[in-house]
Amino acid sequence: MNIGTVPIIACSFLLPTSSLLAQSESKDSYSEQAKFYPSEKIEWKDGPPALPKGAKVAVLEGDPAKEGAFVMRLLFPGGYHIPAHTHPRTERVTVISGALYLAMGDKLDRSAAQKLSPGTYGFWPSGMKHAAWADGETVIQLHGIGPWVITYLNPAEDPRNANKSL
């Protein structure tokens, strides 16, 4: 056998295998698992107690309250704001519509905020201190690893503490 025939023989063994792999991973094999969420069919619910009243949420994948990956959309009414806070895990946010303003630091400093327009993607690392507000009705898509936790820098601004002072 000459050295030039070795690659040809090796390829002849690999071709049937790669053909089988391609068949097992065909587009049709994934159709039962695919899920689509047209914007007009998304079912919005009241936001979680950890967010100020007025937010709406739609969980698209996973469960933000449990360990593991999740995707959720948040709808904020115009003027809605979230006081300065942190998250123990990285957040990945895409603005779908409206405008989200993000200010880094201990307080909601509107003069130092970054405007995130539709289509903007943002990545905020775990522990980053930030505040946000919506200019007009705003929808964002948040990707994260649960459980999703928000810790307000000022406990008095945490909506979960509102009823504790009564």
Name what the model sees in each region:
Residues 7-18:
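Bacterial N-terminal signal peptides
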Residues 23-70, 114, 157-166:
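A short, N-terminal "cap"/entry segment at the start of jelly-roll beta-barrel domains
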Residues 57-60, 71-80, 84:
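N-terminal post-signal-peptidase region of extra-cytosolic proteins
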Residues 106-126:
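Short acidic-glycine-tyrosine-enriched beta hairpin
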